[in-house]
């Protein structure tokens, strides 16, 4: 085989020929500081790598296909953290320090627990304790206001919207969840309850087909769901005018699938909106950063353009993740540095 001919049958040989580890300063998972992290994040000899890959793969990307899809306007909505959120993030920082020093047993607390709690705090503190107050300026409430505005503007054409949230899905167990909270607020503001649906209620293929039909006709105008249940295979684009991302997954493909629900053939709208909601100074920044690292890695390979000899730059999609990371960190100098990095990359 080609790998045997080129003596690349072992991963170490392949890695030394095509890759390099790089060390970069990145946000710590607890969101309160920075750390140096070494990762495999740079490719060399890309033309040779891609010619080998194309022996077994045929790559077609969106920029090659020129499909008649709506133009998407991306908007990052940054919510200021409440004092309570700031306190809770600081508490996570202490937990992370204890875990890192080994003073806490992994069965009691670990970084996975800290990360999950960090995601919850960034979304809504009531996920940590339902008795805590509802912050009127939270990203959840800002999202509700945006949904209401677009719902009102699209009444005549019965335009529809999707809300993605992988955390706090409805379980019907009486506990607080953001799905029920959003619906309650929309109904209180005048949206008919029958126009709001959860994908989780369609638990059979027949129910799902009926629900999708209602969204396409505009009878259901606000549909909430998770990436797993409302990602691939959800064909409801006919009247879709906006998608709202209340949280972010770990894989770039998750965001591609989410946005693919609206940036799709068969949409009557020429322009659509994609909202990314982040809470400044919380784990949101770390999550977008993780996504950026993964997207950069993928983008260097899955491109329709002729690859350069080596690559570590970010593409447009990855750059939007970088911008969000800077906005979230609450430090404008990070954003300025990233903008300068991009300019330097272009000049090179």
State the predicted function of each range.
Residues 235-248, 273-276:
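A short beta-strand element within the Helicase C-terminal
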Residues 192-227:
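Conserved helicase ATPase core of P-loop NTP-dependent helicases/translocases
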Residues 251-269:
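Conserved SF2 helicase motif VI
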Residues 2-133, 149-152, 274-342, 346:
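Inter-lobe coupling linker of SF2 helicases/translocases
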Residues 103-114, 156-180:
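Conserved strand-helix element at the start of the C-terminal RecA-like helicase core
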Residues 167-200:
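Conserved helicase motor "Helicase C" RecA-like lobe of SF1/SF2 P-loop NTPases
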Residues 76, 160-162, 221-222:
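Residue-level preference for the first positions of well-ordered beta-strands
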């Amino acid at each position: 085989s080609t790998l045997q001919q080129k003596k690349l049958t072992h991963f170490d040989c392949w890695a030394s020929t095509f890759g390099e580890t790089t060390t970069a300063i990145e946000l710590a998972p607890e969101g309160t500081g920075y750390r140096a992290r070494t990762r495999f994040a740079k490719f060399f000899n890309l033309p040779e790598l891609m010619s080998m890959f194309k022996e077994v793969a045929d790559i077609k990307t969106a920029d090659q296909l020129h499909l008649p899809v709506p133009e998407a306007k991306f908007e990052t909505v940054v919510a200021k953290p409440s004092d309570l959120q700031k306190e809770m993030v600081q508490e996570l920082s202490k937990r992370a320090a204890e875990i890192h020093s080994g003073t806490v047993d992994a069965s009691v607390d670990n970084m996975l627990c800290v990360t999950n709690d960090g995601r919850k705090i960034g979304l809504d503190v009531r996920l940590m304790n339902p008795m805590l107050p509802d912050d009127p300026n939270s990203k959840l409430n800002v999202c509700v206001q945006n949904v209401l505005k677009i719902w009102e503007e699209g009444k005549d054409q019965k335009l529809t919207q999707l809300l993605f949230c992988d955390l706090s899905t409805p379980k019907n167990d009486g506990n607080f969840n953001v799905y029920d909270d959003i619906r309650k607020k929309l109904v209180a503001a005048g949206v008919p309850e029958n126009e709001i649906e959860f994908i989780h209620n369609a638990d059979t293929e027949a129910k799902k087909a009926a629900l999708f039909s209602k969204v396409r006709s505009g009878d259901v105008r606000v549909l909430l769901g998770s990436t797993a249940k409302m990602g691939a295979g959800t064909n409801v684009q006919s009247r879709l005018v906006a998608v709202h991302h209340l949280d972010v997954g770990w894989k770039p493909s998750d965001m591609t699938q989410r946005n693919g629900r609206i940036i799709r053939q068969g949409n009557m709208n020429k322009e659509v909106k994609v909202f990314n909601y982040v809470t400044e100074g919380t784990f949101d920044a770390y999550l977008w950063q993780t996504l950026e690292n993964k997207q950069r890695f993928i983008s260097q390979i899955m491109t329709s353009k002729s690859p350069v000899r080596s690559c570590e730059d970010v593409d447009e999609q990855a750059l939007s993740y970088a911008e969000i990371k800077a906005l979230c960190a609450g430090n404008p100098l990070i954003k300025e540095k990233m903008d300068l990095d991009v300019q330097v990359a272009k000049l090179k």
